[in-house]
Amino acid sequence: MAVTKLFARYVYDSRGNPTVEVDLTTDKGLFRSIVPSGASTGIHEALELRDGDKSKWLGKGVTKAVANVNELIAPAFVKANLDVTNQSAVDDFLNKLDGTPNKSKLGANAILGVSLATAKAAAAEKNVPLYQHLADISGSKQDKFVLPVPFQNVLNGGSHAGGALAFQEFMIVPTDAPTFSEALRMGSEVYHNLKSLTKKKYGQSAGNVGDEGGVAPDIGSPREALDLIMDAIDKAGYKGKIGIALDVAASEFYKDGKYDLDFKNPNSDESKWLSGEQLASLYEELINEYPIVSIEDPFGEDDWDAWVHFYSKVSSKVQIVGDDLTVTNPLRIKTAIEKKAANALLLKVNQIGSLTESIKAAQDSFDATWGVMVSHRSGETEDTFIADLSVGLRAGQIKTGAPARSERLAKLNQILRIEEELGDKAIYAGKNFHAASQL
């Protein structure tokens, strides 16, 4: 089924910044996709095209990307008479039209909007749910679908929050729940307990939420944050049933070959900055003291030696996730696999800028027996594409914020609907989240 019309506009994301929305029309109807954006972005990511005009939106406008869809992509796309059910041909066409290695001519945000809207149109063309179509084009097993474990970011630090805490995200991971809906209930109850404990201990304003819905109290150390979360898990009655995951986002505080855990202080003491090995030792202590099941971006994105050293120590105990390290880029993923630097991929569709390349990144990871965690960005929207993607890919893990803020819950609510629709044709990944593709 060919596309009769393609149109883009700008709308706003959850941080109040403009982003690209694409409407793609076929004989079956209109299919809409909105592109997310990140706060901490890896230097190896595909280029998100922003206007740079400081007099409007503080330079963050996307009118160029929108114009690229409407003036360059749309006429060529409609003329090419592409079949929406052939996703790889569509994405190949878009990449050739751009012609740069990092999508800097048209903008990854322009290309991705069209790519994702195409998949939605294809699902309608085939009269199947989006997750089913995504399973088809990614070659996933479909005897039973796997529902992901929701990694819920309940406490924010790093670049996502004020306060001194360097680590960016502390997540609860309900691995022992029997179903996705129960996992979400457990997460919600822990989250509410955490909010009330936080307000009690740090004052009313500490219960205010960060970009991704987590609380952001003025906490100084990772242990203080972990103790608070453990108390909330205990208070909710789930001791021993919920794991913890960290997204350190260490590239944000990697300076001159060292790690500055006091990076938000302009006068931080250089003598206290840690080497990669010292930081690895801190992680090992935390892994031994707390039920940590996954650590993302423990080191700087080009500090390969630290990653390899850490992998050799703990890869049998915890999942080591590459985000800034791998940026959903096949070349970076290949290097990380060869070097034995990580054992899981954080999959963000806007880091690579097309659906086909995102699926390829997941497949390469699965082939290396890596885990794959499908992820939102901190600048999110009401679009629920990644919920269907996590199910269609059989990823077994999704990271989409706290059980708060509608742009986060939109994804979690969509998985609830998918769970209901699939009934006994679905299983919850639970403790097998790392190897869900094999279930």
UniProtKB/Swiss-Prot annotation:
Binding site for Mg(2+): D247, E296, D323
Gene Ontology cellular component list: phosphopyruvate hydratase complex
Positions of the catalytic residues: E212 (proton donor), K348 (proton acceptor)
SMART domains documented for this protein: Enolase_C (SM01192), Enolase_N (SM01193)
Cofactor(s) this protein cannot do without: Mg(2+)
EC number: 4.2.1.11
Lyase as UniProt keyword: yes
Catalytic activity: (2R)-2-phosphoglycerate = phosphoenolpyruvate + H2O
Keywords of this entry: Cytoplasm, Glycolysis, Lyase, Magnesium, Metal-binding
Gene Ontology annotations of biological process type: glycolytic process
Entry-linked Gene3D superfamilies: Enolase-like C-terminal domain, Enolase-like, N-terminal domain
Subunit-level organization: Homodimer.
Listed PANTHER family: ENOLASE
Family classification: Belongs to the enolase family.
Protein name from the UniProt record: Enolase 2
Gene that encodes it: ENO2
